Amino acid sequence: MAASAAAANVKIRIVSPGHALFAAVMIWLGVMGLSKGTFVQVWQPVPKWVPAREALAYLCAFISLASGIGLLWQRSAAVAARVIVASLMVWLLVMRLPNLFYETPLVLVAWSFGSTAVMAGAAWVLYVWFAGDRDRRRLGFVADERGVRVAQVLYGLSLIPFGLAHFMYLDATTVLIPHWLPWPAGWAYFTGATFIAAGLAVTFGLFARLAAALSTLQIGLFSVIVWVPRVLAGPLNDFQWGEFVVTWALTAGAWVVADSYRGTPWLAGRVTRDSEGRSAA
């Protein structure tokens, strides 16, 4: 009996493909950070005023690795998700938010903010899924369906600068489009417009499930069509590896947020949720 109870406490728990991918990416980020001793792309740029940069880089890598592993185990999943949410929200507020007011160009600063916000939103969704009754009593909206809605809005707002960057940095966008696709500028404009439309839809809760799913598909296709061939073609430098992993991190984060709409009609204008933050028709 005791052995069975112990086994139950350590069993793996994966609630969705997005959850599994997000955990895997966090582990990957941790391994990269610990092996290099530097901030991987998901944490960059880091302001020059930050002290003890090397120690902080190792701390970020350790949090990523330990929390990624923790997300896969039933007993530790809630704690792991809470640690990721807390660390990413601190990073968002301390390292990203101030830059919106004095750094330029604004769209690139907002892009960095959005990348961190996507991952924070995904971790927040996972935390609500795994949170127990005690967490809901103690933390209120952070651990209930209101927290999921905040996470979804974070994701929606993040998509808007992703789209704007396609228009403002057209040349940098078109060089990433595979040569076998015709009209690269057209694809750049199209994907930029769809990011903006999806961001507005998710933010305002209009056709949000469809918008979240399609934006996840778009980010995932970018990972597969743009980066996988580059990995297969030859060795990447550290920056390119970082960009490759960040793209998969955004794919994983988007997938988790899209999963939070499960059960909602695809064309629903408004969303209701159960006590665990999962959408319900």
Predicted regions and their residues:
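Extended, low-polarity transmembrane helix blocks
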Residues: M1-T38, E54-A66, G70-M168, W187-A193, ...
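Membrane-interface interhelical connector segments
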Residues: K36-W49, G140, M168-G186
